[in-house]
Amino acid sequence: MNIPTLDDLNFSNSKVLVRIDINSPVDSKTGKLLDDSRIKAHVETIRELVSRGNGVVLVSHQGRPGDNDFTDLEEHSRLLQKHLDMEVEFVGDVMGPYARERIRNMKLGSVLLLDNVRFVSEELIEASPLQHSRSFLVRRLQPLFQGYVNDAFATAHRSQASLVGFPLVLRSSAGRVMEKEVSALAKVFNEGEEPKVFIMGGGKVLDSLRIIENLVKRRLADRILTGGLIAELFAVAKGLDLGKDNLQVLEKAGVLSLVPRARKLLLSGAPVEIPVDFKVEKGGQVYEEPANKVTAVIKDVGSTTVGIYSSFIRDAKIIVMRGPMGVIEDERFRESSRTLLKNSLESPGYLIVGGGHMISLLGGIGPLDSSKVHVSTGGGALLLFLAGERLPALEALDISAREVLKK
Ligand SMILES: Nc1ncnc2c1ncn2[C@@H]1O[C@H](COP(=O)(O)OP(=O)(O)O)[C@@H](O)[C@H]1O
Ligand SMILES: O=C(OP(=O)(O)O)[C@H](O)COP(=O)(O)O
């Protein structure tokens, strides 16, 4: 693939639309952002574009409709302003008359943040770059810009309008985050030794299952240590009775229908490990139970599991960690993810850690040795990239290089 970078396009004194990913963990009680790592990550790209006299218009999503973390981007704009140390105008609109008026009238050298792009229904459709290039989002915004930059590595696995539509109609390049992630990950992973251990948790069960299927098919993982909801799915697939409450959680997440796929993976001999115990909560009380005797709602993996997983980590040459083991928004269920992260950092292997929730746990850990760890902004995108899948956002930039830049 031929992905143009900012060095290739050299945007200057232009209006540039920049797709970033500042989707961040949200405290479900207060609605406040719990971490600003992804916001900080984009500062370099934005500063560089501003320093070349460009008017920078930022577009991002936050959460998914119906979820607790589906919010507007006002708080994000304040944090971005703090990290950039310059004014960021928050526009509470994405593509309507107000947004277009603010973009038309903005000064070169200034920064403007549009609202959550998933407020626009077209953004929620997975479609081809060509289809998205004809969306209202692209048709309304494209005439206001001379260029498009995609810096949203963490969403590069989605084929959504703001990611794949613009490269077909604007001169486009990758931003610095996108560029660095792609080159660092390809190098580390391809040149890395075995065993490769993947630690996978979190709430996005369908994504995780797809990734595990890919890893298994390509024989890229020596061990896959599961936590979070994906561990519960595999536990059910293995025939463990997790009780009515936990089945309800899986049903509510719409993932029970994935049990046969998980079962097929287990039967095919996939190296998937499931927890031997869990931390559960009942009536405000927290305690540990063996995986075959669960009587309450699972909130984290148990301490025996952490011990076993840690022994696999110690022997690994490459450790990839994505998605927390438990409901880390609650301090009582943060410990196992934090311990596994610490043990991974202390082990002799190289660590690649990614995803909004996992990187939020790095905060209290102190300075990291960049020769031993790569912190990725991506979670699902990171793993799909490592598993060798083609990421639609990168493909769209590749098409752009061939079809738009050559014209
Ligand atoms: N056992 C569990 N039950 C319910 N939710 C869980 C469980 N374990 C983890 N989670 C949730 O998973 C979410 C993080 O998952 P995800 O978004 O996939 O990770 P990341 O942002 O790191 O890629 C958190 O909100 C956390 O509360
Ligand atoms: O947080 C993200 O992905 P991740 O949870 O895999 O790290 C990205 O912002 C993508 O969000 P999405 O999975 O709702 O498309």
From Swiss-Prot:
It is found in: Cytoplasm. Signal peptide: none annotated. GO terms for biological process: gluconeogenesis; glycolytic process. Substrate binds at D21, I22, N23, R38, H61, Q62, G63, R64, R118, R158. The keyword Nucleotide-binding applies. PANTHER family: PHOSPHOGLYCERATE KINASE, PHOSPHOGLYCERATE KINASE 1, CHLOROPLASTIC-RELATED. Belongs to the phosphoglycerate kinase family. This is Phosphoglycerate kinase.
